[in-house]
Amino acid sequence: MEQKAVDILSKYRLMAIATLRPDGWPQATMVSYANEGLLLYFIVSRASQKYTNIERDSRVSIVVGRDFEDPAQIKALSIAANASEVRDPKQRERAIELILERHPALARLGRPDLEHSAVMRAYCSIVTILDYSKGFGHADILTVAPGGVEMTPARDDDWGFLSGTAEA
């Protein structure tokens, strides 16, 4: 099941990331990313609200997916993660290379100026894999820990659409 999550991450190139503002309100932003397995890399401006939010509180929520006309085709991820700046020069360089390779338009802009940009990583803690081809509302949950990845049995929730309980 971990490979299914990695496949979805590898298929898309844009994610929504939600951070917590100082006033407690969530702030969601779209960012380009690259991944190595379940480890996500992205670049932000040091002057951005999301950078300030992450420096203050590393907890983030991430969504990866795309719009579908047919709900039965939804395949997406909802992720709880901890984000932080990549400070190790070798890992930072690796992250930049992955991002620029995955996003050629960014590569044409040149390398990020590290005085103004921060290379970030997000360590996934909980990964919910949405796969509605297995049934409307189908979700498998992965818990990622230092010892490995554990899967929680699938949760199916048709939201009342298929059970006849939906109100018109």
What is the meaning of each model-derived region?
Residues 66-67, 124:
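Short secondary-structure boundary segments
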Residues 1-3, 48, 101-106:
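Charged, amphipathic alpha-helical segments
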Residues 75-168:
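Charged, gly/pro-rich active-site loop segments
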Residues 9-10, 55-56, 100:
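Alpha-helix boundary recognition
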Residues 1-15:
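Short, basic/aromatic recognition patches
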Residues 48-50, 69, 135-137:
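Short, surface-exposed beta-strand-loop junctions and turns on beta-sheet-rich folds
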Residues 13-46, 52-54, 60-66, 73-79:
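Short beta-strand segments
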Residues 11-13, 26-29, 113-116, 123:
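Short, basic and Ser/Thr-rich N-terminal targeting/leader segments
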